[in-house]
Amino acid sequence: MLSARSAIKRPIVRGLATVSNLTRDSKVNQNLLEDHSFINYKQNVETLDIVRKRLNRPFTYAEKILYGHLDDPHGQDIQRGVSYLKLRPDRVACQDATAQMAILQFMSAGLPQVAKPVTVHCDHLIQAQVGGEKDLKRAIDLNKEVYDFLASATAKYNMGFWKPGSGIIHQIVLENYAFPGALIIGTDSHTPNAGGLGQLAIGVGGADAVDVMAGRPWELKAPKILGVKLTGKMNGWTSPKDIILKLAGITTVKGGTGKIVEYFGDGVDTFSATGMGTICNMGAEIGATTSVFPFNKSMIEYLEATGRGKIADFAKLYHKDLLSADKDAEYDEVVEIDLNTLEPYINGPFTPDLATPVSKMKEVAVANNWPLDVRVGLIGSCTNSSYEDMSRSASIVKDAAAHGLKSKTIFTVTPGSEQIRATIERDGQLETFKEFGGIVLANACGPCIGQWDRRDIKKGDKNTIVSSYNRNFTSRNDGNPQTHAFVASPELVTAFAIAGDLRFNPLTDKLKDKDGNEFMLKPPHGDGLPQRGYDAGENTYQAPPADRSTVEVKVSPTSDRLQLLKPFKPWDGKDAKDMPILIKAVGKTTTDHISMAGPWLKYRGHLENISNNYMIGAINAENKKANCVKNVYTGEYKGVPDTARDYRDQGIKWVVIGDENFGEGSSREHAALEPRFLGGFAIITKSFARIHETNLKKQGLLPLNFKNPADYDKINPDDRIDILGLAELAPGKPVTMRVHPKNGKPWDAVLTHTFNDEQIEWFKYGSALNKIKADEKK
């Protein structure tokens, strides 16, 4: 086994030269850390050729990767937007908050080790408080039980483990594991970040990860392909982030649902690999299954810079037939973006698809009465923490410093990985930020996911923050519903920190230097890759031991952080009748509303405790309040989890009624485990976000959609619900919902669903995990 970082400290080698002794039959490792995981390009091409003969049409790049990973290329039905594909991903990546439940589920399956390469990354449990080293030490102390569990479980079941301080999962994957043409799934919704290296990287729930860990095919509804044609070249203050911010404004938060976003056109060759990663990362904010760029020179340069030149050379041998779209490949729809005319965007507040070009922000902010003083500027996160991001932001800081200016706001910097932190420390950007007044946070997710002990304002104070993050839902970053959070490029965030004003436009507006003289900030500049190569920094990787027989994984029965799982009961074979509505949620109901992160992250391995946050952020249509619902039997108003428990403890099934794009946001399967644990039976909505809908199915719940969305408005919180015809539940066949109003005659509504035959078995068995265990016994 190679040392975790031994091969990464090497100078950049630019160019397209191919290693002469490589052939298309060569065995090439997927990465520098695992000896026995090889790139399967030849098998992918053979599988793809079978499908090509069947379909007899040109393929997009995304289709090539998908069809090259089919479990049964001869028999698989393939219709974009219709079929369910059975796929064989190359590997799995898990972050520490979702890994706990994924591993607990894997343990309950009783298997000796994972069937595919798996890594676990400690990035979600580190709270930003005072700064990097102190925050990291505090997190290691607070989360020792969880980290010890993950370290021992990964060792026991043959997984790689990245310790706290390593960095954010997606940056680590890009630096070490991503390669063109691969298919990876990850238990985090921003897994698509790896699309910047030409990989199909898809966010999933933990139960999906368990399928692959157990050696089973993984199922995905065949996505449609949204082609985004990029022409021209960016200049000045425009950055890759602005492409996805503009696209979010065009498509909205659900415009990518059921689709892969594939970028093409001459503009794709103008970005760095990390810039392409930024664009793919935030495709999650439009609901896309994933996003991807075709293999190109920038990817070769990044692979070489990170010690993986052999992979780059191997990929060149498969460029035409596997790692690029066919000529005349057809997309289901196409959006065109002219990079020459693209300007910087600021998206928000409260939703990532409210897109405002910087030239319009002044008038829009004033018209909407948004707080104009920027209180905090935050750069970094999995979306924007590359060497290029940090270098370009540092160039702006240096320009301001030359005029005697420092940050007018609180300014935080989150390095994406230990490698990035060590490199920008060596090259001086870190010191530049500190002199500017910046606070360098730990190599972790931090404020982006609500891990922020913010103390400069009180909860309820109206204020504005601007970050280079990806999400800006209400209360997400700091728990304050009055924080107006905007997302932008790190360059623009830095400019706002200097000006301290949301109305500032660095393209047109002047600042005053320390002597009162006016000047304009110069456009940002910076290297895409470090000229002296990357500095690996501290070794933070734990490889699984060769002998795992003596490794013990312990979970204390008295722990409040970890809890072994008990199987959910199978369906009783009967229609569900007279069910109360736990809550009729109105408006945006994201996974942050359903299962809040922040202070609740510490309970992600303990289903009973984490269930105390179920739907506490959702707004009740009856009274427009959060976490205040009526028990229809007692008339008492209580919190949502308390009321759900009251129903469950009396043996009463219940339903939730939801609005559009229910479950938007994170991949966290806790948002599906919790309603199942609390006795829920069905979640009935106008529409679902992809990952959440799948997670609900995996846990034996019924995600159902109103055929007529207007029926949502006809339902009252006091109504009782029957779900009829479940014995005949079949793919494509609607079910009947009978509504019993408190006063009035019953009425019926048609509910649709997306269940296929196997998913119906999950429902009948009580969960997908129950089905796996039953199959293992056969």
UniProtKB/Swiss-Prot annotation:
Key words, A-Z: 4Fe-4S, Cytoplasm, Iron, Iron-sulfur, Lyase, Metal-binding, Mitochondrion, Phosphoprotein, Transit peptide, Tricarboxylic acid cycle
Known EC number: 4.2.1.3
The record's catalysed reaction(s) read:
citrate = D-threo-isocitrate
- Name the InterPro entries on file: Acnase/IPM_dHydase_lsu_aba_1/3, Acoase/IPM_deHydtase_lsu_aba, Aconitase/3IPM_dehydase_swvl, Aconitase/IPM_isomerase, Aconitase_4Fe-4S_BS, Aconitase_4Fe-4S_dom, Aconitase_dom2, Aconitase_mito-like
- Factors inducing expression: Highly induced in the absence of glutamate. Induction is further increased when both glutamate and lysine are missing.
By what means is the activity of this protein regulated?
Subject to catabolite regulation.
Q: GO molecular function, one example?
A: iron-sulfur cluster binding
Q: Which cofactor does it need?
A: [4Fe-4S] cluster
Domain of life where this protein originates: Eukaryota
Q: Which residues carry this modification: Phosphothreonine?
A: T409
Per the record, residues carrying Phosphoserine are: S391, S556
Look up the record and name the pathway of this protein.
Carbohydrate metabolism; tricarboxylic acid cycle; isocitrate from oxaloacetate: step 2/2
Note how many cofactor molecules are bound and how. Answer: Binds 1 [4Fe-4S] cluster per subunit.
Protein residues bound to substrate: Q95, D188, S189, H190, R471, R476, R604, S667, R668
Consequence of gene disruption: Essential for growth on nonfermentable carbon sources and for biosynthesis of glutamate. Causes a dramatic increase in cellular citrate levels.
Any idea where this protein resides?
Mitochondrion; Cytoplasm
Q: Where is the transit peptide?
A: 1-16
Oligomeric and partner information:
Monomer. Binds to mitochondrial DNA (mtDNA) and identified as component of mitochondrial nucleoids.
Further remark: The fermenting yeast S.cerevisiae has 2 aconitases, ACO1 essential for the citric acid cycle, and ACO2 specifically and exclusively contributing to lysine biosynthesis. In contrast, in respiring filamentous fungi the ACO2 homologs (acoB) seem enzymatically inactive and the ACO1 homolog (acoA) is solely responsible for these functions. Present with 96700 molecules/cell in log phase SD medium.
This chain belongs to the protein called Aconitate hydratase, mitochondrial
- Organismal lineage: Eukaryota, Fungi, Dikarya, Ascomycota, Saccharomycotina
